[in-house]
C-alpha cells in the first residue's frame, strides 16, 4: 500500500504548531490545569488533520469513496458540471472525520472548475448548488466513462484545496485535495452505475466501494 504522505496532513502543520506552542507556553507559565483546555484543543487539531493510508480494493470497475464520512444522498439527478443525467452519491464529513480527499477512479482530468458560493450546512441538499465548491471531471482510463468529483465547503469549512489540474493522470486512492473542518464531496456517475451504499452508511476514503460501473 503506497501512500506517500505524512500521517498528519501538511495542511494542518501550522495549526498544530500554533496550538502546541500556545499550550506549552501557558503550561510553563500558569501550570497544567490552566493549560488543560489548550492541550485538549491541540489533541483535537492533531486528530482532525490525521491522514492515514488505506487499503484500496482491486475490483477494476469499482468507484471508491473520495472521503471519509456518512452517505447523505443516493439519487438519479442532473450532473450540472458535465451536462448529463447521472447517479449522484454524496459523502458528508463532520469535524471528526479524516478530511483528505482521494480519487475514486483511474483516469485523466478533463476539467477543473471552481465556484464561489455560500457556506450553509454541507449536510443540506442545497449545499451542492449554493456553497463554495470545486469540481473535477475524470475520464476513466479503462473505458472512457466520466466521473465527476465535487468538493463542497460547509458551515465551518471555508477552504477547499485541490491539487490537480487538467491533463493529470490520476490513480484510485491518490490524494487530490483537502477540505478543512467539516464538508462534503458529491460524486456523479453514469446512470447505469450500480450503487453499493445506502443513505446513513459510514464510508472510508479509498477503501469503501460506492458503486460499480458497467464495463463498456
From Swiss-Prot:
Extract the InterPro entries matched here. PS_Dcarbxylase, PSD-A
Drop me one GO molecular function for this one.
phosphatidylserine decarboxylase activity
Q: Which residues are modified to Pyruvic acid (Ser)?
A: 183
One GO biological process term is: phosphatidylethanolamine biosynthetic process
Name the needed cofactors.
pyruvate
Record text on subunit structure and interactions = Heterodimer of a large membrane-associated beta subunit and a small pyruvoyl-containing alpha subunit.
Name the chain's protein.
Answer: Phosphatidylserine decarboxylase proenzyme
Q: Which organism is it from?
A: Cupriavidus necator (strain ATCC 17699 / DSM 428 / KCTC 22496 / NCIMB 10442 / H16 / Stanier 337) (Ralstonia eutropha)
